[in-house]
Amino acid sequence: LDFSAGAGLATHGAAALAAVPEGGLLLSHTDLHWNPARYLRACEGARPDVTHLSLQLLPYPWFARQHPLHPRMKRWPDVAAASTDPATERYERLVEDVATGNLDAFPAGIYLDLHGVHEPHIGRLGSWRGRWNLVPWGLHYRIVAAGAVQGDAGEWLARSLAEIDRLKAAYEGGPPSPDRFRVGSWEIAAGAAYNDAHSCVGCNPTRGALS
């Protein structure tokens, strides 16, 4: 990918990977989140330490043939009734099954596409499905066990803010804007994701740390 000043997708993919600590698990939902990072890993050799999965592809029966390519996965979810719609119970159960079966296998953390969750389902301090907290983490949410954030909300907020600083540094000249790219393009979508990442830090997942 071209990393020139106009290469918004390259920057987006690099920023997504940079937010994942060594050995982490990255779960993509949107094409925008999946393809730039996948290209960098597959074609440019970036971040071979990261396990990267698409929640759009995971439910397909044929994907079972790909399991050996991801040896660090401890347990694969039951995808018989899975959905790819984040607003549905079946999709949330898919994500939860991945987290439940693999949180111990990835001590560096599990990171979910920022747009891979239905925002109205996220409660105070990022509580989600009663068992988890979703912590804003740049272009992702970090999935952590329930109670972890409540115990030290200020520390988790500091981590969220540090990831925003990292994201801002990646987009040194600012995110793609309609002045340079066509509305509806992937570059503009990348700019929207950049702005959403900033907004999420001030929303429910960290609001309790500020009160």
Task: Label each region the model flagged.
Residues L1-T11:
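Active-site cores of enzymes that catalyze phosphoryl transfer or operate on phosphate-rich substrates
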Residues F3, A14-L25, H29-R38, E44-S211:
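C-terminal luminal/periplasmic domains and tails of membrane-associated envelope-modifying transferases
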